[in-house]
């Protein structure tokens, strides 16, 4: 098992970042996400927005890794649940893969909150727990996957910035 974590500060208020995060896919920074379907979306009695989405991703696994894992599949599906609390100004997003689960599990949690010292900024904390199952070199593969998650996190931050910039340019 490998745990990866990160923190990123956006130079935008929470409302702006959350609107962009909800529209994050598709984006040109991370073309491996090839499909997003909203399965369910509802407001609870406290005004929090709950969303269930299904994401389809194209994993660019090197042929050596595919051979070690014993799979030729590159399309994977991810289940995502998010809760946006506009009163507390907090968004929590949890995701987990629902394909290749016999080989690997990736459980990710993202939390968006206003910066405690500057309300014009937003803090994103991310954590991923990666477990490769039943193969030799699992620690090595978990490290590779943590590196990929780190790279994709940066792409995600860039995508949110790109969405914000493009939204602002279309409004002005």
Curated annotation (Swiss-Prot):
It is found in: Mitochondrion. Residues 1-172 form the PRELI/MSF1 domain. The record marks 36, 49 as: Important for interaction with triap1. Keywords: Lipid transport, Mitochondrion, Transport. It holds the Pfam family PRELI. GO terms for biological process: phospholipid transport. GO terms for cellular component: mitochondrial intermembrane space. One of its GO terms (molecular function) is phosphatidic acid transfer activity. Belongs to the slowmo family. Interacts with triap1. This is PRELI domain containing protein 3A. It comes from Xenopus laevis. The lineage of its organism: Eukaryota, Metazoa, Chordata, Craniata, Vertebrata.
């Amino acid at each position: 098992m490998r745990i990866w974590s990160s923190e990123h500060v956006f130079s935008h208020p929470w409302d702006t970042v959350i609107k962009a995060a909800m529209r994050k896919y598709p984006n040109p920074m991370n073309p491996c996400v090839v499909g997003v379907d909203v399965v369910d979306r509802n407001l609870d009695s406290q005004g929090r927005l709950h969303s269930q989405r299904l994401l389809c991703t194209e994993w660019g696994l090197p042929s050596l890794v595919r051979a070690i894992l014993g799979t030729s599949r590159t399309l994977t599906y991810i289940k995502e649940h998010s809760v946006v609390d506009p009163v507390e100004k907090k968004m929590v997003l949890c995701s987990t893969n629902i394909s290749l689960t016999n080989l690997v599990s990736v459980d990710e949690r993202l939390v968006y909150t206003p910066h405690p010292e500057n309300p014009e900024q937003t803090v994103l904390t991310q954590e991923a727990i990666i477990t490769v199952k039943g193969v030799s070199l699992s620690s090595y593969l978990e490290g590779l996957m943590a590196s990929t998650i780190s790279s994709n996190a940066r792409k995600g931050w860039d995508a949110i910035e790109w969405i914000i910039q493009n939204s602002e340019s279309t409004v002005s």
